[in-house]
UniProtKB/Swiss-Prot annotation:
Homodimer. It comes from Shewanella sp. (strain MR-7). This is Bifunctional protein FolD. Its EC number is 1.5.1.5, 3.5.4.9. Pathway: One-carbon metabolism; tetrahydrofolate interconversion. NADP(+) binds at G166, A167, S168, I232. One of its GO terms (molecular function) is methenyltetrahydrofolate cyclohydrolase activity. The gene is folD. GO terms for cellular component: cytosol.
């Protein structure tokens, strides 16, 4: 068996096209264009690339994009004050603060300062809690994008045995909640998990988000499983690889996401979807 590739790049492009059409329709109806504020503190190269991609995608769909590139020395107090301003700005529907933040700024304080109705990253405890209670509104972008990828396969998720490898607040934990909501029997694995191989070999659906190149051997993948590889790791020779050993996994899986071009584009597409949702549901 050779897996079908789940083309996140193409699916994300389709979403952006639909969003652009919706923005055009809003303008023609005399409605406001959605606005996204993107805040970057410091000069982390990877963060600069991510933020650049988000701003470009905003412009492509016709959103207003407001950029704040702040020096590493920017204080926590000043950042919270900026968030307060944007919370009160009626032209801004979404506020995104690129993580990680410098050591002197507490991530949780910043995340919780963003008003839940403008939390388009889906990180605020209110929005995570809504997902946990099965009434999601603004959902965490990467898991939301992954669910779109899984739906694109046409596979019925109800009753699937799913394994999530990684338990971060950004991907692993909300991913577990999304899969529960989709009717999966879900196991979350982390650094203390025993018998990881056994759990993965039994899984119909595997989502891996640990940030370690080739962490999951391809031969562990059950024949016919769906493999979602969230990892994006640059090797010394410059090659980008995922957390799963792709070549062997692709021989066992029924569907697999490539790296790059799988999950990454969907995270940004979901961010844009959340921004339009916030405009329509909360701010119109």
């Amino acid at each position: 068996m050779t897996a079908q590739i789940i083309d996140g790049k193409a699916i994300a492009q389709s979403i952006r096209t639909q969003l652009r059409e919706k923005v055009t329709a809003r303008k023609e109806a005399g409605q406001r264009v959605p606005g996204l504020a993107v805040i970057l503190v410091g000069a982390d190269p990877a963060s600069q690339v991510y933020v650049g991609s988000k701003r470009k995608a905003c412009e492509e769909v016709g959103f207003i994009s407001r950029s704040y590139d702040l020096d590493t020395s920017y204080t926590e107090e000043a950042l919270l004050a900026l968030i307060d301003e944007l919370n009160d700005d009626p032209t801004i529907d979404g506020i995104l603060v690129q993580l990680p933040l410098p050591a002197h700024i507490e991530d949780s304080k910043v995340i919780e300062r963003i008003r839940p109705d403008k939390d388009v990253d889906g990180f605020h405890p209110y929005n995570v809690g809504r997902l946990a209670q099965r009434i999601p509104v603004l959902r965490s972008c990467t898991p939301m994008g992954i669910m779109t990828l899984i739906k694109s396969t046409g596979v019925d998720t109800y009753g699937l045995d799913a394994v999530v490898v990684g338990a971060s607040n950004i991907v692993g934990r909300p991913m577990t909640l999304e899969l529960l909501l989709a009717g999966c029997t879900t196991t979350t694995c982390h650094r203390f998990t025993k018998n990881l191989e056994q759990k993965i070999r039994q899984a119909d659906l595997v989502v891996v988000a640990v940030g370690k190149p080739g962490f999951i051997p391809g031969e562990w993948i059950k024949p016919g499983a769906i493999v979602i590889d969230v990892g994006i790791n640059r090797l010394e020779n410059g090659t980008l690889v995922g957390d799963v050993q792709y070549e062997v996994a692709a021989q066992n899986a029924s569907f697999i996401t490539p790296v790059p071009g799988g999950v990454g584009p969907m995270t940004i597409a979901s961010l844009l979807e959340n921004t339009l949702y916030a405009a329509e549901q909360y701010h119109d």
